[in-house]
Amino acid sequence: MCVKQTRVLARQQIVPAILAAMLAVTALGAVCRAEDWSQFRGSGARGIARSAVPLAWSQTENLHWKTRLPGPGSASPIVHGERVFVTSYSGVDGNGAPAQLVRHLLCIDRATGKVNWQRQIALEGPEDSYQGYLTEHGYASNTPVTDGQTVFAFFGKSGVVAFAFDGKELWRTAVGKESSNRHWGSGASLILHGDLVICNASEESQSIRALEKQTGREVWKAEGAALELAYGTPGIVTLSDGKQELVVALPEEVWGLDPATGKLLWHADTALTGNVSPSVIVDGETIYAFGGRGGGSVAVKAGGRGDVTKSHVLWTSRVTSYVATPLLHEGHLYWIDDRGQAFCSSAATGAEVYRQRVAEITSGGRPVYASPIMADGRIYVVTRWNGTLVLPAA
């Protein structure tokens, strides 16, 4: 159960930014010896691995390898078998002009850190300037996804690109060239559903799109102005009768769509105002959604039709994680918000169990954006300036 305090078990410093992703890869590679981590937040998008990872590491301790990247990136690495895939970007000058912007996808050998291949995705059309909040995450924030044969990567206005495991480009599909009114850039990650690659292109075209895995052909497109500022990754709910729904959180609403057609099945009004950056969390037929700057969180039961605000909203709360997607574990939701406060809330009621400032996190600014993951019963949170924190879940 969740206790009314948090205690840091370990804190590990991060090496310079150009190598930071590779420390995560090292830990993630250990996690994935017994299981693949094929998408954002791993299997089922739950952020939980069964295997153990080290409690301590440094430049020399518990570090199997490190590999220099072409530039920074905010996406998570993914792992399939002996391959690690990670993205980054380069070519942004000191004035913030992205005219020479290049995105990169790397395939790295998990055992040695050797780069098997690297592919460059050149800028296609105008891109948002590197200024304001875009500097907080950059141009490589969308985690790739793989089905074990092909790796799919989303590069915002440069589109969705599919590569074979040998590095051959299979197809490339544009999903829009627009910008939101904030000009914050893209953040949502791809998910797979059957033969479809599903992309939240809210930033690029105020749409969610499904592409055919084999060809990149657009199968359906769901559009709506309400999608603006919806930066989270959609999720899939499997109902008790076997039917499935695609769910996504957006400002003031949660949507349930038919993943085969994109048709809107139901919607629920919420108090998730402002930008909505956290991704939905799915547990059985329950969807948990957290707001961004405006705050708020909500639990909604899937499976309804039409406006389900009065019938399917299970609870609402004023607390939020701002950017991070909380971790659901044994009936509790865990996260550290952007100000460095650790939270635990009841998944059944939304009631706050504890809120505590983490002393090891530097105050000021926004020190935490990363979503927590769990390995061997411990919670790992990567901070922006204070390394990686390891905390108990109980």
PLM segments and residue spans:
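Bacterial N-terminal signal peptides
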Residues: 16-29
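N-terminal hydrophobic alpha-helix used for membrane targeting or insertion
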Residues: 2, 22-24, 98
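A periodicity- and composition-biased signal for non-globular, repetitive helical segments
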Residues: 10-13, 19, 47, 52
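Noncatalytic, solvent-exposed loop/strand surfaces
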Residues: 29-394
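N-terminal secretory signal peptides that target proteins for export/translocation
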Residues: 1-15
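Helix-centric, low-specificity signal for extended rod-like, repetitive segments
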Residues: 4-6, 26, 34
